[in-house]
Amino acid sequence: MSDIMSNFSWLYGKPVATGKLKQLPEHFIVKEILGFEFTGNGEHLMVKIRKTGENTKYVANELAKFCGVKSKNVSWAGLKDRHAVTEQWLSVQVANSDELNFAKFEATHPGVEILEVTRHNKKLRPGDLQGNQFQVIATEVTDIDDVLARLEKVKLAGVPNYFGSQRFGHEGNNVNEARRWGRDNVRTRDNSKRSFYLSAARSWIFNHIVSQRITEGYFSQPVDGDILLDRNDRIVNENVTSEESIQKIQNGELSITAALAGDNQLPTTGTALTLEQPHLDAEPDLMALIRGNRMRHERRAIELHPENLTWSAEGDTLTLNFSLTSGSFATVIVRELLQEIEVERTYSSND
């Protein structure tokens, strides 16, 4: 199977080490961080789940049936990996929950535990997710000393804030479908599928821009015409190549950004524009899809710094612990450390 991420540059060079990820679900543990408290009352039942080997949408649909509501009445802040142990909240719009016995739900769904139940006055939305805590265990790791040396670099300078391979689908099928939709001017009422392919299209172009900056030596070095963001994701208007700006970038106060393509003109100028525009021009079908859906241009930081990064190694097993903000991918951190050996998995039909 081809690795779709091999299209993009490594910040620290292609790893020499190899290893296996998610050999077992408990080798990839994710805990959601919402960043706010629930009111304790309201029309939405908030259910905290721990799921193993199940995807979020399947559990949400099953929970809707159990609560006697439609699937559209169950929502979440973020979708979580299937082949993992993940904790997250689901909100269920249901008036009366006194008769619900969640022990019965657990008995018929062995891959799901109900950890906590409360109420809130609003349903969960994707924007509610602040981030996630991760524990990632890699097994059968070779060249462990090289991995440990790379971890020191990651802790100091971060990794490229690439979108992970899951955004692009199996062997890039989501990107290929997005191209077809743009080329054939496909129209649909399926907002979920439309959003899916638009995200793949914009992510693909973004990754290529970041990859070129690495290749040309501009990953942590601003160029004229760059657009910077502060820690609150606000655009900062200042001399981006000044010593002061460079120092703030190194301190993490400011971030260099790359384009999430839209139907409006790129706001970058000068050298920054020459690093971005060719990648939009190289994908006319993806841009046709983006423009046809009137997506507006956005910016995304090109560097990703995992918070509270710690690690331990025992034999050929590596354990990583870290937190990431919403929208970032744990797999792009591991990508800088080792080449993943594919693990064959068998799934049930709960897709």
Curated annotation (Swiss-Prot):
GO terms for biological process: tRNA pseudouridine synthesis. It is an enzyme of class 5 (isomerase). InterPro entries: PsdUridine_synth_cat_dom_sf, PsdUridine_synth_TruD, PsdUridine_synth_TruD_CS, PsdUridine_synth_TruD_insert, TruD_catalytic, TruD_insert_sf, TruD_pseudoU_synthase. One of its GO terms (cellular component) is cytosol. Signal peptide: none annotated. Keywords: Isomerase, tRNA processing. This is tRNA pseudouridine synthase D. One of its GO terms (molecular function) is tRNA pseudouridine(13) synthase activity. Its EC number is 5.4.99.27. Pfam families: TruD. Belongs to the pseudouridine synthase TruD family. The active site is at 81 (nucleophile). Residues 158-304 form the TRUD domain. Responsible for synthesis of pseudouridine from uracil-13 in transfer RNAs. PANTHER family: TRNA PSEUDOURIDINE SYNTHASE D. It catalyses: uridine(13) in tRNA = pseudouridine(13) in tRNA. It comes from the Bacteria. It comes from Aliivibrio fischeri (strain ATCC 700601 / ES114) (Vibrio fischeri). Disulfide bonds: none annotated.
